[in-house]
Regions:
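Alpha-helical segments in soluble extracytoplasmic regions
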Residues: 24-139
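Bacterial N-terminal signal peptides that target proteins for export
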Residues: 1-6
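Bacterial signal peptide processing site
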Residues: 18-20
C-alpha cells in the first residue's frame, strides 16, 4: 500500500539528502502517512461504506489539507508536492461531502457523479507518493 512505500522510503533519504531537504521530506511524508493511517482506521471496519464513515473520511481529508497547508517548506519541489496534496485532499473532501449529501436525499445520479469525483481525486495519491519518494531519495 501507499503507506508502506512512504515508510520504506524514509530510511533511504535520511542518509542521502541534505539536512534541509531531508527534514522537509520527513514533515511532508509524516502528514501524508498520518492521513493514510486515519483513512485505514475508518475504512477497516465492515461499516466503511456507511454515511458515518464517509463523514469521518471528509474530516480526515479536511484536517490533512490544513496540516499540509501549515507545513513550513522552502524546497520548491516539496512546495509543489504539498500543493498537489492539498488540491487532492480538497477534492476528496468535496467529493465525499457531495456523496454524503446525495446519498441522504437518495439522488442516484448525483451519488454516482460524487463517487466518480472521489475516485478521480484519490487516484492521484499513488503517483504523487511515488514522485515524492523518488525526489526524496534522489542523490543516493
Amino acid at each position: 500500500m501507499v503507506k508502506a512505500s512512504i515508510v520504506a522510503a524514509l530510511s533511504f533519504w535520511l542518509v542521502g539528502c541534505s539536512e534541509n531537504r531531508s527534514s522537509q521530506c520527513v514533515k511532508l511524508i509524516g502528514v501524508a502517512n498520518q492521513a493514510v493511517n486515519s483513512i485505514e482506521a475508518v475504512t477497516a471496519p465492515s461499516s466503511a461504506d456507511s454515511i458515518e464513515a464517509l463523514r469521518k473520511i471528509a474530516v480526515v481529508a479536511e484536517d490533512t489539507n490544513k496540516a499540509m497547508r501549515d507545513l513550513s517548506l522552502t524546497d520548491g519541489k516539496l512546495i509543489e508536492f504539498r500543493d498537489r496534496f492539498t488540491a487532492m485532499y480538497e477534492a476528496t473532501s468535496a467529493a465525499t461531502q457531495s456523496l454524503i449529501q446525495s446519498s441522504s436525499i437518495k439522488d442516484t445520479a448525483a451519488s454516482q457523479k460524487a463517487y466518480e469525483d472521489l475516485k478521480a481525486s484519490t487516484s492521484q495519491e499513488s503517483p504523487l507518493v511515488d514522485e515524492v519518494n523518488q525526489y526524496c531519495n534522489a542523490g543516493q
